A protein has these predicted regions:
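Conserved small/polar residues in nucleotide/adenosyl-binding loops
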Residues: 257-258
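Flexible loop/turn segments at secondary-structure boundaries
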Residues: 91, 175-177, 225-228, 252-254
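Short polybasic linear motifs
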Residues: 7-9
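Non-catalytic, usually N-terminal nucleic-acid engagement modules in DNA/RNA processing proteins
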Residues: 19, 24-210
């Protein structure tokens, strides 16, 4: 409940630019079908097909659903959008290999929308294995221990190689117990990283060898448990007129109060 205003701000600013816009190479179209209070029912039009919202995204971290679930099975259960992870596909299989194979859709044999997480959550979950700088994050692979650097530009390049429908911005996922001073610095850095993500995504979408030139970028709202920081951050990032926004940092060990 503390984050309702932040989510409302993101929704309002996105709807102003998207709900009346035509689907084109720079922006998807969100069609609002029904609204009651803050609850919304809509259709999100993408280059890989429509998504009826609200929606549950089936998670295929490394390009496959666990439990021997095939993409035919996903269609059978009416899956509208599949979620894969940038970090995991980068360290194992490899995003460059997937690009050579025609992108994640062909790799998976899946023709519906795919959302790729930026890898930020996984990187920042490796607390003892990473170092944060303004440029990005240096960390060690959980597979073989090799040193890897990932920043906003690297995350966008990996996701462009994967050619997903929706790419998530590279952000910092601070601990829920981080103090206010750290959260403020972290959020400011996440905003600067988002500007870099947008610039790099626009560049990548213009390249002749890019598989999905209509790849969309979603920003991520952060702010820990501080409502005022989240509202301010939502207002700042909504001005970038991105294709969509997410509310992040709600599953990084938030404390349970009784």
């Amino acid at each position: 409940q503390n984050h309702n205003e932040a989510m409302k701000q993101c929704n309002n600013d996105y709807n102003k630019t998207a709900k009346e816009g035509e689907l084109n190479e720079n922006m998807a179209k969100y069609e609002l079908l029904k609204q009651e209070g803050r609850a919304k029912r809509g259709t999100f039009h993408t280059v890989h097909g429509d998504i009826q919202t609200p929606v549950f995204m089936n998670v295929g971290t490394v390009g496959a659903i666990k439990g021997a679930v095939s993409t035919d099975d996903l269609k059978e259960i009416k899956c509208q959008v599949e979620l894969s992870n940038t970090y995991h596909l980068h360290v194992r299989t490899g995003d460059k290999i997937i690009k050579e194979l025609g992108g994640l859709h062909k790799f998976m044999v899946w023709d519906r929308p795919i959302l790729t997480d930026s890898g930020g959550f996984q990187v920042f979950s490796l607390a003892g294995l990473r170092r944060i700088r303004e440029e990005g994050v240096t960390f060690h692979s959980h597979i073989d221990g090799r040193k890897i650097f990932m920043g906003p530009e690297e995350s966008m390049r990996i996701q462009s190689n994967l050619a997903s429908t929706i790419a998530m911005a590279f952000d910092e996922c601070p601990s829920s117990v981080a103090d206010r001073e750290y959260i403020e610095k972290s959020v400011a850095r996440t905003t600067r990283w988002l500007v870099r993500c947008k610039k790099e995504m626009e560049r990548l979408n213009s390249l002749p060898d890019t598989i999905n030139k209509h790849q969309m970028l979603f920003g991520i709202n952060q702010g820990g448990v501080y409502e005022d920081i989240r509202i301010k951050h939502a207002d700042e990032i909504s001005k970038l007129n991105l294709d969509g926004y997410a509310v992040g940092g709600l599953a990084v060990g938030c404390l349970l109060y009784t």
